[in-house]
């Protein structure tokens, strides 16, 4: 990622990571409203989705099946939960708050067949990050389901999203506001933005806008953000003992 970013900048080329989470109308709404909740003290995001391939993977490991390991769990393809879905919890965090001071990961992994012999591949992880004056934590899994909401907590209130990878609903609670607070009967404010029927259009729209305006970097999906996220993912993999053939 670092080499690609350097090459793109030196040659004046447009390069943008196709990260939908940080280009969606609801993420933009979050950025617009985040000052309303005061100084942020914690960020939490979860993306847990039981993979349709994990049952097949278990049969391959046990010898019941002899087919190739699915790409999403294949070390030869640099697969695993962190690379596949964990990034959707981490990229928005970096876009909002920058690179953390520290990363502490608890990684669950299994051994799967690979070209150069069995290798560990991560199926889920929980990660804690430290920032000046705040903390962040993420949870992601391809081996379990969860309906946990994403929440950004501040001194004056909080903002929650139904899901972090493609946000379709967002709400805000500001302490003392007429529509919110902790009093009986108070309701959070719905801050959901109008979205396209096809959520992925926001990625194409951002890229086209960059081309038409002559810019070579997205603000939210900047090269600095992409490099920072790649470095965080490397730290998580290192702490979990996840090594790919492509790392050589």
Task: Describe these PLM feature segments.
Residues 1-22:
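Beta-strand-loop-alpha-helix segment that lines the small-molecule cofactor/substrate pocket
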Residues 10, 206-248:
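C-terminal helix-rich "cap/oligomerization" subdomain common to oxidoreductases
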Residues 21-106, 115:
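Predominantly a Rossmann-like dinucleotide-binding segment in NAD(P)-dependent oxidoreductases
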Residues 89-169, 205-213, 247:
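Contiguous beta-strand/loop segments that form the cofactor/metal-binding neighborhood of enzyme cores
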Residues 150, 167-184:
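Short polybasic amphipathic segments
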Residues 191-205, 221:
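Active-site loop of classical SDR/Rossmann-like NAD(P)-dependent oxidoreductases
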């Amino acid at each position: 990622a670092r080499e690609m970013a350097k090459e793109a900048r030196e040659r004046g080329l447009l390069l943008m990571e196709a990260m939908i989470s940080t280009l969606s109308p609801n993420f933009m709404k979050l950025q617009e409203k985040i000052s309303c909740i005061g100084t942020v003290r914690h960020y939490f995001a979860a993306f847990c989705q039981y993979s349709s391939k994990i049952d097949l993977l278990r049969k391959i490991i046990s010898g019941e099946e002899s087919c190739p390991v699915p790409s999403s769990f294949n070390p030869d393809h640099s697969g695993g939960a962190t690379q596949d879905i964990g990034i959707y919890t981490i990229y928005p965090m970096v876009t909002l708050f920058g690179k953390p001071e520290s990363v502490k990961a608890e990684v669950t992994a299994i051994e799967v067949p690979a070209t150069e012999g069995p290798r560990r591949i991560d199926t889920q992880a929980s990660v804690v990050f430290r920032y000046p004056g705040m903390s962040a934590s993420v949870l992601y899994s391809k081996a379990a389901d969860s309906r946990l909401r994403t929440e950004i907590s501040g001194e004056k209130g909080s903002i929650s999203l139904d899901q972090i990878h493609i946000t379709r609903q967002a709400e805000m609670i500001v302490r003392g506001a007429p529509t919110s607070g902790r009093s009986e009967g108070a309701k959070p404010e719905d801050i959901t933005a109008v979205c396209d029927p096809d959520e992925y259009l926001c990625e194409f729209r951002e890229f086209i806008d960059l081309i038409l305006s002559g810019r070579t970097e997205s603000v939210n999906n900047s090269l600095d953000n992409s490099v920072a996220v790649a470095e965080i993912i490397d730290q998580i993999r290192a702490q979990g003992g996840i090594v790919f053939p492509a790392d050589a």
